[in-house]
Every structure is written in structure tokens, then in C-alpha cells.
């Protein structure tokens, strides 16, 4: 539980009182006995000293505002004495004396109106510890290892790949070990603790280790010694090893299912899911206000939005509510199924039951996963039946070997309004299948034959289903990395799909550049999607999200819109009819090609897409399209264009020409500068009026970054450009939105601090704390302020939620 940012109104001196509200019972001294409470939690008392200085400035600002008001407050706030005074805690005294609105010690502390205690207080820490203890008791006491992991680690250590026989009844897993440890470090630790054992195995990068004992006496003694032992500030947990020959009727069954792993909120009603997500977003807004208060420079007044956050219950801005998804079941248009072994050791296509880092290796079929469409689930079943009889092995994540790795199913729907979940499924018109394999060490001829059989299996399975499953394109992706997340340039191969025609077999060949794609629709626009391009997984709800973003951006014909991290151009293209010009930035060349193709398909001519990392070009683009507009119109632009074209490489220069369709775009009436080749730049026949920059009165940026958030260079470019007054931030990870907003909204320091070079090396530092540190080095510039926020449920049944926030200055 985090330190509360909720404060009460400072009372005018003439009306202050020490008498608590009559409705609140005094707290007996016995309930706050320090001896009975656990030791201090360092996480709960984060930056206590910094809070005092910020609160002092807040008090001074509030006091000034209240002294100028004629209104007198005669009743103490319900938050009176509900938080501990940081001055009193540190100095054993406070300048406010008995009139301080904060509690001077545990005896004065009152319970908050929401029936919680100050998290930095002893009672708050005790409540947190009890809650964590209850949570740990509910956790599984088994680790979903299979013998595959034990054999892999054993083979690695043996050097020759030999496998020893392991008695699982005499084996235990040690959870919460340092992930940098290997078997030698684990054995050394066991020896230091005086633990006798038969074998001990540990792989770097995992937090679990595997220990086998000689007999039951050794096992019992080892458990007594190790259970709860502290290692690097973490408490060890002893867990049983779940054998892959696990009997589903076993009385020990308490295994998390694929449904629980993928859709953890599916057990709740949808209304309860929405309420839980709205509350979670509210906590993020409180976190933003709390961290902004800490980040503000000493000696400066806090921003008004921080001071008024207490009037909103601690929220940095108003939370407008949550937008629900029109469809809640089978809504995902992209599903990535892992290939591995089930608990029974059978090759399985489905979802992993947990984190690989935590030692979870089992894969379960996507049965009863409400976010997966029936079509995707059927294709997973078809693929599983095929690999069960394949001569090639499934991927072994421990030995980094094998052939079959992953199946991705992408779906494209017809346009229209979806009235229910079933209607959304029946509108699926196109399907792309992408099978990820590792070709390392495989015979080329055998692979070619296997791929032919694979295409035949998918085609026959699709035709045998009732109704027939759509199958538009089949792609194979070659990837040999450790993780299944392949780089954007991983080799792709389109397979011919055999089709049946009047009893004869014919082959339909496809072209990798023109046919390896499907189409979907958003706001009646048709979008072309390549195998690896990003596209919102819930297009129906994405329409609502983009509509909100456009409304909040206050768009108009004189607006220049920057679509940062634009993907296939969905945001910019859906809003293009409302603005003068759209500049999209995306690092994925395939997605940029799709964006340009999508503009052509829909006849949109006022969009330009740049293929590059946003942090590399954002600053130059802002100068190119904004700074030049302030120059005198009479000034020749040919030289300026030459310089700017040198700064910003064209799409063709940054990608292979076969992936880019920019040259096919119709000419734009508002596009101010084409990314020209050298001959065009040197031509003297250009008419001056065609190269003149339009005067955009309104400049807006909409950012939709990946879960990692915006790069610091992008944040700096957005923050320091004076022409950019409005920013709409769309985030699938509210945690990173908060971190980025801290840098965007914190007032500038009088003298920017270059910071401690070793700051990144601090252990267990949160992204919010790192953002506060980076804010110190932000160049002097006007800060944004959060205006309003909205939650949008793009992912029903999961604990993820999209968040959109409007920032202005």
C-alpha cells in the first residue's frame, strides 16, 4: 500500500481546533502498542523526508489561499489527523504545534474515512503485513515443473547430456533464489546452511532451484532449515515439484488453469471487472499526484493541479469513468499460442500456466478462455494434432532446442456494428496463421516436406469444420532466439495453401509482398495488416478509444497532428478527415508500409509516415514542421528543405523499397514537403508556392507507445517544444504513463541537474522514482498539466486496461 497523497484543507488560524469530529471515536492507546507491531517496511516509508519539504510548501500555498478567502471553516475535515506528520517524526517537533493537521505520533493518529490507516504508521504496516500473509497463504504450494526442466538442467551440468533418474517424492523446489545464481552458488549456499542433499540444480535467470535428498530424514531436516530463510532480502519458499505424470483426478489438484492464467478476472461479473479496473486507474492518478509533489523543485510553489488534487480525493485530474467493451467474449483478433509440453508430457498448443522465470513450464490448451475466439481455438487444436505426429520436436525452453515454437492466429472482420459476441465471431472474414519455428540444424528437404504437410493439415482442418473456417494466408517465421518474441526482421515464408476444386487438388500460390496480409475495419476504414504489424486486438472498442482521443485533442482543419508510435496508422487515418495534416512515426518498417498502403486504400492524402524510432526523429520533425512555419513567407525554402531532408531520412532511405508504398500515394493538397530524392532537391523548376509551409494554428500530439512507455528523448522533445500545447497520451500500461507524465508535468528546476550517473544502478528503484530523478535534468520549459483521464476496457476478463489522458499547457 502506497503513501497516501490525500490531504485536508488547512484551517484558518482563527478557526482551527484540536477537537476531533464527534462522529469519530478516539483511538485507545492499547491498540497502537509498538511492541506488538512488525518492524518497519522500507517500501512503505519511501522518501519520507522528501515528503516533509513538499508538504511544507503545500501548507504555505494553501495557507496563503485560505487567508485571502472570507469563507470560514468551522468543522474539521474528515481527514484531520489521519496521516503522520513527517516533521514531527523526523525532528520530534513541528512548527504548527497542536494546530498541525497531521498526527504527532501514533496516539493522535486517526483512521481514514475509507477505514484504512496511514501506510507509514505502525498500524498501517501491520495491516499490510497481514494482507500479504493472507495472500501468500492462498498461493500454490506446488511449482509446475515437468521432468523436462530437471532433465535439461541435469544434462547441462553433465556436459554429455546424460539424464539421471529423479525421485520426485524426495525433491523440493526452492523459490525466491537470486536469479543470477547457478548450481554452484546453490550448492555453496546449502553447504553453508548445513543441509545434506543428493543433488542441487539451478539455472541462471530463474528464481527457483531444484534439490533432491537421499532419504525422507534429509528432506525433513532440509525443509526445516531452509523454509523462510532469508537470501538477499527475500524469504525462501519450499514448494513441491509437480510431476508431468500428474493425474487430473489427484486429490492434490490445485493447479492454475489456462483460463486463470490468461483471464484472471473471468470469475467476476463484467460490472465488477469494470469497477475493479476503474479503481486501479484511480490509484494510478493518485500515484501521479503523489510523485509530482515529491518531484517539484524545492523553493517553488506546487502546481495548482497538485494543490487541488486533495479536492478530487488525491487524483491528479478528473477520472471521467470507464468505457466498456461492446463485446466481452472472443474479442481478440490476435492470439499467440505457445508450443510446449502439458502436465502429462504431451505436445500442446495453448497458453503457458505461468512465468518461465518462476519455473513454470507447463502449457495447457486454450479451453474455456473467454477472450479467445472459437476460430482461433479451433486452429490451435488442428495444429496440436499435427505436431503430435510430427517428426520434429517442440521447443525446449531450457535447452534452447527444438523446432515448433508458436502459433499466431490473426483475424480480420467485416465492417459493421456488433450487437453481441456471437455477431462479432460471425463477421470474421479473413484469417492469417503464422507458425514460428527454429530451422537451426534441420534438413532443408525434410523441412520443405513438413511445411507441405502442415499447409495440407490446416486446409483440411478448416474445410472439415462446421461452419468452414476462413483461411487467407499461412506464414512461417524462422526465429532461433531464446524468447518467442522475434525481431521485426525475422525471415518470413508464405506457404501455398492447397484448395479443393471439384475433386481435384490445386495449389494457390501467394506472394510475400502483396498477399501476406489480411484486412480489418475501424470506423468504416479498411486496414491492411501484415504478419508482424501492430494492430489493436479489440477493434470494436478501439473505435471508441480513438473517438475519445480525437475529441479531447480539439482537432480542426488548421491542426497539425503528430501520431507518435502510429503502428499501421489507425489513429492518424481515422482522424485525418478532422485535421489539416497527420505526421505518423513508427519504427517497424512493415507497419509503415501498411500505414501507407492503408492511406492509399482509403483515399487519404493528408498523411505522411516516417519509418524511424521516435526518439531519433521527433525533435527534428517538430523543427521541420513547426519552426519553419514561423519564418517569413518570402524567404526561399529550397536551402532549408535541403538541410531538413538531410536531417530526416526518407521512408525509402530507411526501409527496403519493396516494403514501402509511399510512391503510390496520391498527391496531397496539404502535404507541405515531399521527401524528395537528390534530383528533385536540385531541380530549379519547383514553384515556390508548392514548397511553402502551411501555417498550422493548432499543433497536437497523440502518443500510443508500447508497454515500456516513451523514450526519454521523445519526452524531452515533446516537453521542450513551445508550439506543442496539447498532448493526448494513450497507454496500455498505466504505470509507464504515470512515469512519463511525471517528466512532462514537473515544473522546471532553476538549474537543471545532470544527475548522478550511478543512479540507474540503484537496486529496486521504481520507474516513478527514476522519472522524478530524470525530471531534475529536464531543460527549462513550460510543464504540462493533466486535465482529465478515461479508462477504456480493451481487454475484458484480464487485469489490463487502456488509459487515455489529456495533457495541456
Swiss-Prot record:
Binding site for S-adenosyl-L-methionine: 536, 586, 704
Keyword Zinc carried by entry: yes
Region (Disordered): 1-74, 652-693
One Gene Ontology MF term: transcription cis-regulatory region binding
Entry's Gene Ontology BP terms: methylation; RNA processing
Basic and acidic residues compositional bias, start-end: 51-65, 678-692
Residues annotated as catalytic: 732
Positions of C3H1-type zinc fingers: 79-107
This protein's name: Zinc finger CCCH domain-containing protein 24
Biological source species: Arabidopsis thaliana (Mouse-ear cress)
Amino acid at each position: 500500500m502506497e503513501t497516501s497523497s490525500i490531504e485536508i484543507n488547512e484551517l484558518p488560524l482563527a478557526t482551527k481546533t484540536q477537537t476531533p469530529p464527534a462522529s469519530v471515536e478516539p483511538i485507545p492507546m492499547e491498540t497502537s502498542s509498538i511492541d506488538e507491531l512488525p518492524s518497519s517496511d522500507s517500501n512503505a516509508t519511501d522518501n519520507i523526508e522528501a515528503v516533509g519539504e513538499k508538504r511544507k510548501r503545500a501548507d504555505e500555498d494553501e495557507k496563503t489561499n485560505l487567508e485571502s478567502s472570507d469563507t470560514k471553516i468551522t468543522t474539521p475535515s474528515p481527514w484531520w489527523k489521519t496521516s503522520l506528520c513527517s516533521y514531527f517524526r523526523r525532528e520530534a517537533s513541528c512548527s504548527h504545534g497542536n494546530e498541525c493537521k497531521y498526527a504527532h505520533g501514533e496516539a493522535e493518529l486517526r483512521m481514514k474515512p475509507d477505514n484504512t490507516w496511514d501506510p507509514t504508521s505502525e498500524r498501517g504496516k501491520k495491516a499490510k503485513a497481514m494482507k500479504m500473509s493472507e495472500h501468500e497463504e492462498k498461493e500454490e504450494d506446488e511449482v509446475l515443473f515437468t521432468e523436462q526442466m530437471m532433465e535439461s538442467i541435469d544434462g547441462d551440468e553433465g556436459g554429455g547430456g546424460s539424464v539421471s533418474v529423479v525421485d520426485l517424492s524426495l525433491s523440493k523446489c526452492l523459490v525466491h533464489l537470486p536469479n543470477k545464481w547457478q548450481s554452484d552458488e546453490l550448492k555453496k549456499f546449502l553447504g553453508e546452511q548445513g543441509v545434506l542433499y543428493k543433488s542441487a540444480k539451478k539455472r541462471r535467470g530463474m528464481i527457483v532451484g531444484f534439490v533432491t535428498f537421499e532419504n525422507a530424514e534429509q528432506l525433513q531436516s532440509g525443509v526445516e532449515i531452509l523454509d523462510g530463510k532469508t537470501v538477499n532480502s527475500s524469504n525462501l519458499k519450499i514448494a513441491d515439484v509437480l510431476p508431468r505424470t500428474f493425474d487430473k483426478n489427484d486429490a492434490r489438484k490445485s493447479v492454475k488453469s489456462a483460463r486463470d492464467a490468461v483471464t484472471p478476472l473471468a470469475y467476476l461479473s463484467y460490472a465488477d471487472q469494470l469497477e475493479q479496473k476503474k479503481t486501479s486507474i484511480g490509484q494510478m492518478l493518485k500515484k501521479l499526484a503523489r510523485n509530482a509533489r515529491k518531484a517539484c523543485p524545492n523553493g517553488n510553489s506546487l502546481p495548482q493541479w497538485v494543490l487541488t488534487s486533495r479536492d478530487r480525493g488525491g487524483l491528479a485530474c478528473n477520472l471521467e469513468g470507464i468505457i466498456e467493451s461492446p463485446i466481452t467474449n472472443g474479442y481478440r483478433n490476435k492470439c499467440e499460442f505457445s508450443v510446449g509440453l502439458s502436465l502429462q508430457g504431451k505436445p500442446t498448443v495453448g497458453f503457458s500456466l505461468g512465468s518461465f522465470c518462476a519455473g513454470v513450464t507447463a502449457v495447457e490448451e486454450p479451453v474455456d478462455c473467454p477472450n479467445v475466439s472459437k476460430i482461433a481455438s479451433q486452429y490451435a487444436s488442428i495444429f496440436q494434432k499435427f505436431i503430435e505426429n510430427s517428426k520434429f520436436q517442440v521447443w525446449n525452453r531450457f535447452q534452447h532446442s527444438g523446432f515448433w515454437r508458436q502459433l499466431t492466429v490473426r483475424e480480420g472482420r467485416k465492417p459493421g456494428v456488433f450487437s453481441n459476441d456471437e455477431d462479432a465471431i460471425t463477421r470474421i472474414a479473413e484469417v492469417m496463421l503464422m507458425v514460428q519455428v527454429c530451422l537451426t540444424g534441420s534438413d532443408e528437404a525434410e523441412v520443405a516436406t513438413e511445411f507441405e504437410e502442415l499447409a495440407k493439415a490446416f486446409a483440411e482442418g478448416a474445410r472439415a469444420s462446421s461452419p468452414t473456417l476462413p483461411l487467407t494466408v499461412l506464414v512461417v517465421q524462422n526465429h532461433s532466439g531464446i524468447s518467442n518474441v522475434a525481431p521485426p526482421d525475422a525471415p518470413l515464408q508464405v506457404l501455398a495453401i492447397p484448395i479443393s476444386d471439384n475433386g481435384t487438388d490445386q495449389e494457390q500460390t501467394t506472394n510475400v509482398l502483396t498477399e501476406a496480409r489480411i484486412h480489418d475495419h475501424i470506423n468504416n476504414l479498411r486496414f491492411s495488416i501484415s504478419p508482424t504489424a501492430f494492430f489493436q486486438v479489440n477493434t470494436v472498442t478501439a473505435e471508441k478509444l480513438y473517438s475519445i482521443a480525437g475529441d479531447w485533442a480539439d482537432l480542426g482543419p488548421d491542426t497539425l497532428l503528430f501520431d507518435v508510435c502510429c503502428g499501421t496508422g489507425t489513429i492518424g487515418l481515422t482522424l485525418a478527415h478532422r485535421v489539416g495534416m497527420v505526421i505518423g512515426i513508427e519504427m517497424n518498417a512493415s507497419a509503415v508500409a501498411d500505414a501507407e498502403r492503408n492511406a492509399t486504400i482509403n483515399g487519404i492524402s493528408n498523411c505522411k509516415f516516417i519509418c524511424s524510432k521516435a526518439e531519433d526523429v521527433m525533435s527534428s520533425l517538430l523543427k521541420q514542421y513547426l519552426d519553419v512555419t514561423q519564418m517569413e513567407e518570402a524567404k526561399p525554402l529550397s536551402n532549408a528543405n535541403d538541410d531538413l531532408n538531410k536531417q530526416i531520412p526518407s521512408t525509402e532511405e530507411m526501409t527496403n523499397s519493396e516494403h514501402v508504398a509511399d510512391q503510390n500515394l496520391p498527391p496531397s493538397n496539404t502535404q507541405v514537403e515531399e521527401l524528395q530524392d537528390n534530383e528533385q532537391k536540385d531541380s530549379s523548376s519547383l514553384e515556390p508556392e508548392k514548397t511553402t509551409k502551411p501555417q498550422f494554428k493548432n499543433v497536437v500530439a497523440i502518443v500510443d507507445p508500447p508497454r515500456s512507455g516513451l523514450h526519454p528523448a521523445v519526452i524531452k522533445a515533446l516537453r521542450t517544444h513551445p508550439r506543442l500545447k496539447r498532448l493526448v497520451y494513450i497507454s496500455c500500461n498505466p504505470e509507464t504513463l504515470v512515469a512519463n507524465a511525471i517528466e512532462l508535468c514537473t515544473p522546471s528546476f532553476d538549474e537543471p541537474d545532470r544527475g548522478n550517473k550511478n543512479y540507474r544502478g540503484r537496486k529496486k528503484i521504481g520507474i516513478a522514482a527514476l522519472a522524478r530523478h530524470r525530471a531534475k535534468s529536464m531543460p527549462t520549459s513550460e510543464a504540462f498539466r493533466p486535465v482529465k483521464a478515461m479508462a477504456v476496457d480493451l481487454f475484458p476478463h484480464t487485469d489490463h486496461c487502456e488509459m487515455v489522458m489529456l495533457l495541456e499547457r
